A protein has these predicted regions:
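N-terminal, intrinsically disordered, basic low-complexity segments enriched in Arg/Pro/Ser/Thr
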Residues: 1, 79-82, 154
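Interfacial loop at the N-terminal end of multi-pass membrane proteins
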Residues: 3-65, 103-124
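Transmembrane alpha-helical segments in integral membrane proteins
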Residues: 15, 63-76, 136-156
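Juxtamembrane transmembrane-helix termini
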Residues: 28-35, 70-74, 97, 101-110, ...
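Helix-adjacent hinge/juxtasegments
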Residues: 52, 59-91
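Alpha-helical transmembrane segments of multi-pass integral membrane proteins
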Residues: 109-149
């Protein structure tokens, strides 16, 4: 690590933070909290999970913006910058468009009584869109990691 360029170190740390916030926040912590209804009812569990989901999305967005910023110097490949910007756009859309609408839709639903059915269906669709967006961000970040692991031949 001593001879490592700063852009490489920053890029690797930001990539790890972005992937970690997706996996830990959106895949492990938030679903576990929402599913744990033994101590609180389902409506309260979902309300308690909302700030965690938003903070996790904000961490991911910040890390992805850093990845996009250092991608050119870190990866030395045009595809790295493109993938970084794509991930940043997806993360921003997820945080500022999809998540607020999803949480608003779930707030209008009574999960204990499971009513109204039409609003539950709409909230489930928004949840599916959020999961697809988080998956797409993760795929783009893994593509960046693969691109970072390739050894490029030096130009002579």
């Amino acid at each position: 690590m001593l001879g490592m360029r700063p852009a490489v170190l920053i890029g690797i740390l930001a990539l790890g933070l972005a992937l970690g916030s997706i996996v830990l926040g959106h895949v492990i912590v938030v679903p576990t909290l929402q599913a744990n209804t033994s101590l609180v009812d389902a409506n309260l569990a979902r309300a308690l999970a909302e700030p965690l989901a938003l903070r996790s999305a904000e961490l991911c967005l910040a890390a992805v913006v850093v990845v996009a910023a250092v991608a050119r110097a870190w990866l030395r490949h045009h595809a790295g910058t493109t993938l970084g910007l794509l991930a940043a756009g997806l993360a921003a859309t997820d945080r500022f468009v999809i998540l607020p609408r999803m949480h608003e839709a779930w707030a209008r639903v009574d999960l204990v009584a499971m009513r109204p059915a039409a609003r539950i269906e709409a909230a489930e669709q928004l949840s599916l869109i959020h999961e697809a967006a988080a998956g797409a961000i993760a795929v783009v970040l893994v593509a960046i990691a693969v691109l970072a692991s390739w050894k490029r031949e030096a130009k002579s």
